Amino acid sequence: MKRQSVSEIREIFLNYFKDKAHAVVPSSSLLPAGDPTLLFTTAGMVQFKPLFTGAVELPYTRATSCQKCLRTTDLEVVGKTERHCTFFEMLGNFSFGDYFKEEAIDYALDCSVNHLGFDKEKIWVTVYTDDDEAEKIWITKGIPKERITRLGKKDNFWGPAGDSGACGPCSELYLDRGVEKGGPDCATSGTCRPGCDCDRFLEFWNIVFNQFNQDTEGNLHPLKQTGIDTGSGLERVALLLQGADSVYDTNELRKIISFYEELSGIKYDDVITLSKMPTQKNNTARIAANQKAAFRVVTDHIRSVLFSIGDGIYPDRTGRGYVIRRLIRRATLFGRKLNFKEPFLYKLVDKVVEIYKPRYPELGKNSAAIQKTILAEEELFLKTLELGLEKIETLVAKTKTSGKTIFSGADAFLLYGTYGFPAEMTEEIVAEQGLDFDKKGFQEELEKDRQLSRESWKANKVSLMTGQSVEKTEFLGYSSLSGKGNIIHLFNENKPAGALKEGQAGAIVLNKTPFYPEGGGQVGDTGFLRQGKNVFKVLDTQKENDVILHFGEVLSGEFSIAQELEAEVEAARRERLRFHHSGTHLLNGALRNLLGDHVLQKGSVVSPEYLRFDFSHPSALTSKEIRKIESWVNESIRKNYPVVTKELPIEDAKKIGAVATFGEKYGDRVRVVQMGDASVEFCGGTHVSHTGEIGYFFIKKESSPGAGNRRIEGVCGPAVIETFQNRFAELTESVQNLNLKIKSELDNEGSKILVNSNVPGPDEIREKLEKEGATAVTFFRDLSEEIASQIEESTSAFLKMKKSLESRDFENNASVIEKVFASSMDTGVGKIVSAIFDDKDPNSLKGLSDNLKVREKNLLVILGSKNADNASVVITCSSQLVSKGIHCGDLVRTVCEMLGGKGGGKPDMAQGGGKEKQNLESAISFAIQLAKQTLTGEKV
């Protein structure tokens, strides 16, 4: 066999199918566009699913690709086997109603043998159990019947990717690697063939004969046109062609391992040699086996994490992000076996990017953000890791205390799911403690978890158009807010209806409409559909399969199929939507210009009231950055760029730098919206004709919707005026309420902390914004922040002053002093007084103590307070009692020990506290007894 590099194999494959009239299609994102049933792109056919089912018009009938893929179903064996990876590249060729079984089989064999260099005499194939046709074709191509194996549905019926889509029987190509790769019994039994669990036969090419479409209920329906979907794992092909021991020993992955060798000081080849020694009672071999797995795990996981973050999938608490976080944590844990105690993964980003940048240039643009994100995750987990190690100690102790010798699978899964501990690491740790590991119990818990997260999400939205004859709705709304259209569908209670009557709610479909359906973040239009006295109020507009549905209720009259209606969009609302949608584009442009190309749109809401924009960015924006972004947008508004929309072939749109919305699926032709030099984006929404129409832009809030992402909420045009009017109205009310409280509770003493700010009124705000535009936005932002700061400072001063006055009143309160003395204890040498209060700080207790000592010369004062989260205690005494042996510091330490806290001080004054406030009474009582014993010599 020829020994080719990974990049050479990739190019040979793609060029072969290019010569066979296949369109070479670039890899899609790891985030499946428009497919909620998949967490990640798991196969080459994912981006082609609509083409197989006939849901979209075919741009080509033959295609080939090298697709980035991510699968975590075999995560626990990654690093242990020679072929499993979470991230891999899938080579594939596809036919959409063009060729079928014979050509697909011919291409696979020809490419494998005559171009990639596989030995035909070592190739075995499998076919579906009743696929006689495929078997006959293989035989005619020169594969003898004895090297053809029939397998059942589990092995040779593939698909769909997700819980719906194209699927069918398949045929796979295997390479016979020799009996030495087989299991103990394989060499002598003579029955070893594809399907055996040993490593002798390795599958390297799968041909799926797509004949069915599986719906979300699992039902199979014949496809209108058959198709071919093939998959050939690039890493696995390289393993075979390079004669490597594992995919990790192929040229690209071995290069990544060399980076880890350099960082760790451990040689991978030495580890491999030692790991092959007998492991029984051989600690060196056992350590080496663990280090071999560690090298492979961190090598695999850095690719998965790097490519995922590069595609905008950031670590998070749920969904896709959780998988990425888990991979980082798993790699961090395995890194400890290579002596990595500090963050290390992030250090490899630039080097790994260099390997893959020629094929995936987008990685180079995002490398800084990827590195920053990984570092933050590593630092976060290292804090969690110590907690996890403490937890495992607790669980081991619990197991031993209960008399058990087996560490439970449930406890192991707790460590796996909560702290990211791989089962093998837990097994190793508990073995050192003399415990067996419940593998079966762990697997049962793991399987339960898999069933809950099987890489698919169910969509709950009711599909009104299922089973309906589809006639696309012509959208008139780019140029007009009104127009005529005929009713072609009616729905009532989510079911087709012949008519809608007064008082009924439902949906109306017209053949033409000016109503914009929700899409691209922009909410659907509202308005009215009319015919004479028949009036339908549109409350929302949605789109399904190019059909626009008007949801609402019949206010009067009746509606039936074929009626011609006058459609009228609510103009004022649409205008605000235009302001906010165009503002969103300018905001996106500002973020990419000021923060970097790693910024990807992760979601948006365009409503009449505000805009919300989610984007990938690893850290919170500073106040300075927020102001720069806001100013950049306002400057683009001031320049009054013309807003130009045009339809272009998608490749032409990409050439002019048009920015795609993350996760969206596009056809061959796209609508592009350009705003001068500020923004060029794919977009189907409604916009202003010139940016100057927007007026002004203001950022209300910046926050995080999840790890690795940021969110900006902003307003444009009239909404800016309303925002500042509301904000200053709230500030006015806050100032008035605070000043009133200061005057009423502090009298003249509070005059210095009153808020003296001239808050602008509604008319003043409107006039200044309309006159000065963006300059006024900055002015009102600064003024509102200044007034808010004054309110905060005055509130703090008020509370401090109020507390001081309350403390002074408390310390000098005659009735409090009398009450304390009423419970005094006379020892004959001096008096002891004590009391417990609620919510008093140590200074107040000390002040009261000083006033008590003024009344008595020989006095010991023990005061305590129960506060919200703790208890505090102050003990003071006169100098005469110090000479009698009293030491307040010693007494406080005794009390605080009973409170679970600390304290101390001088002989005549000490203070402290603790969390266990429920013990305050008994602690003070004990201190009194100790003091009495010291003063009288009597034992207590």
UniProtKB/Swiss-Prot annotation:
It comes from Leptospira borgpetersenii serovar Hardjo-bovis (strain JB197). The keyword NAD does not apply. It comes from the Bacteria. It catalyses: tRNA(Ala) + L-alanine + ATP = L-alanyl-tRNA(Ala) + AMP + diphosphate. Belongs to the class-II aminoacyl-tRNA synthetase family. Pfam families: DHHA1 (PF02272), tRNA-synt_2c (PF01411), tRNA_SAD (PF07973). Catalyzes the attachment of alanine to tRNA(Ala) in a two-step reaction: alanine is first activated by ATP to form Ala-AMP and then transferred to the acceptor end of tRNA(Ala). Also edits incorrectly charged Ser-tRNA(Ala) and Gly-tRNA(Ala) via its editing domain. Zn(2+) binds at H581, H585, C683, H687. It is found in: Cytoplasm. This is Alanine--tRNA ligase. SUPFAM superfamilies: Class II aaRS and biotin synthetases, Putative anticodon-binding domain of alanyl-tRNA synthetase (AlaRS), ThrRS/AlaRS common domain, Translation proteins.
